[in-house]
């Protein structure tokens, strides 16, 4: 639970460029995980959910910032 709070505070302090950079890295990792799964080489399947949730958290932070700039 503390890791989640740390991640949220880290996301709120990162710049938009850093968030997009991390988002692209996570998308590449997700692609590689899917590729490994297709080949049958994937050992840690729980990594899928962690990467997907991290992507969602970053997208949520970006949306929150975009909405706050509109008002």
Curated annotation (Swiss-Prot):
InterPro entries registered for this protein in UniProt: Ribosomal_protein_uL29, Ribosomal_uL29, Ribosomal_uL29_CS, Ribosomal_uL29_sf
Any matching Pfam family: Ribosomal_L29
GO molecular function: structural constituent of ribosome
Similarity comment: family membership: Belongs to the universal ribosomal protein uL29 family.
PANTHER family: 60S RIBOSOMAL PROTEIN L35/50S RIBOSOMAL PROTEIN L29 (PTHR10916), LARGE RIBOSOMAL SUBUNIT PROTEIN UL29C (PTHR10916:SF0)
NCBIfam families attached to this UniProt entry: L29
Membrane-spanning segments: none
Keywords: Ribonucleoprotein, Ribosomal protein
Protein name: Large ribosomal subunit protein uL29
One cellular component (GO) term of this entry: cytosolic large ribosomal subunit
Xref: Gene3D superfamilies: 1.10.287.310
GO BP of this protein: translation
Top-level taxonomic group: Bacteria
Species this protein is from: Rickettsia rickettsii (strain Sheila Smith)
Gene from which this protein is expressed: rpmC
């Amino acid at each position: 639970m503390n890791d989640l709070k740390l991640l949220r505070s880290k996301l709120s302090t990162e710049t938009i460029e850093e968030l997009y950079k991390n988002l692209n890295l996570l998308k590449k990792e997700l692609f590689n995980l899917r590729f490994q799964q297709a080949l049958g080489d994937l050992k840690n399947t729980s990594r899928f959910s962690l990467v997907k949730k991290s992507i969602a958290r970053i997208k949520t932070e970006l949306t929150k910032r975009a909405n706050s700039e509109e008002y």
